[in-house]
Amino acid sequence: MTAEPAEHRRQWPVPPLDGYTMDDLFTLPDLPPHTELIDGSLVFVSPQRYFHFAAIHLLANGLRSTVPSGLKVVCEMTVVLDRRNGPEPDISVVRAEAVTGPRQIRFEAADVLLAVEVISPDSEARDRDTKPHKYAAAGIPHFWLVDMAGQDDHPVVQVYERGEATGTYALTGIYHDHVKVSVPYDILIDLTTFNEY
C-alpha cells in the first residue's frame, strides 16, 4: 500500500494567529458548503440526520405560511454577528428589505428577528450554548432550539426571547404538538405533521 501522492492531498489553510475573520470566510477558496465562523475558527458541518432536514422544512414551511410581507424566511444563510463570528442558523426570519438578490451570501444580525437551530449530534454544544449566547449578544430578539424527543423522535421546539435589560435569552415556552406564538409575528405550526416530511 502506498501513500497518496502529495499533489492530491487537500491543503487546508493555515489559520492566522488571531483567528479567521468574516472577510476570510467569504474569500478563502474551496471551503466546504455551510462552513461557519465561530470565535475566529472555521467550523465544518458534518453530514446531517434526516430529522434535521425534515425539521427545517416543517418549520420553514410553517413560518412562511403566516409571514408578514415585511419579513422573509430563509434557510442556511450566514449571519454576520461580528468580525469573528458568522454562524449559519438553520432558519432565519429576516427583514424583507435585507434581501438583496439571488447572489446574496449573508445577512447582518441587525436584520434578523428570529434564528432557529435544529440540534445535530456533532454540534449539540454549539447549538445549545455557543450560538444562542452569540445571537443574544448580537441583538437577535428571538431564538428557537429544536430537538428530538419521545419514542417517535418528533420535534420539540423551545422558544426564547431576548430581554432588553439582560441582553440574554429567557425561555418563554416549550412546544410538543403545536408552536403557537405571537412574536416575532403570529405563528402556528403543527408539529404533529412531522412524519409527512
For each of these PLM feature ranges, what is it?
Residues 1-197:
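Gly/Pro/Ser/Thr-rich low-complexity, intrinsically disordered segments predominantly at protein N-termini
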